[in-house]
UniProtKB/Swiss-Prot annotation:
Pfam families: Toxin_cobra-type. It is found in: Secreted. Disulfide bonds join C3-C23, C17-C40, C42-C53, C54-C59. Expressed by the venom gland. This is Short neurotoxin 2. Gene3D superfamilies: CD59. GO terms for cellular component: extracellular region. Keywords: Acetylcholine receptor inhibiting toxin, Disulfide bond, Ion channel impairing toxin, Neurotoxin, Postsynaptic neurotoxin, Secreted, Toxin. Signal peptide: none annotated. It comes from Naja nivea (Cape cobra). Belongs to the three-finger toxin family. Short-chain subfamily. Type I alpha-neurotoxin sub-subfamily. PROSITE patterns: SNAKE_TOXIN. Its main location: secreted.
Length: 61
């Protein structure tokens, strides 16, 4: 699996994730504004955090 791997303030990067079958994109708000995080897997999240999980390469753009 190949996923986008970054946080809002970072430049976009790509990561190869051996053994993973999902990529994710999390989104939440705090005092800095809307924060977006991308990576490998499909983690559980706290209440108030939106998550999108997908199963194809680079699908979490």
């Amino acid at each position: 699996m190949i996923c986008h791997n970054q946080q809002s303030s970072q430049r976009p990067t790509i990561k190869t994730c051996p053994g993973e079958t999902n990529c994710y994109k999390k989104r939440w708000r705090d005092h800095r504004g809307t924060i977006i995080e991308r990576g490998c897997g499909c983690p559980s999240v706290k209440k108030g955090v939106g998550i999108y999980c997908c199963k194809t390469d680079k699908c979490n753009r």
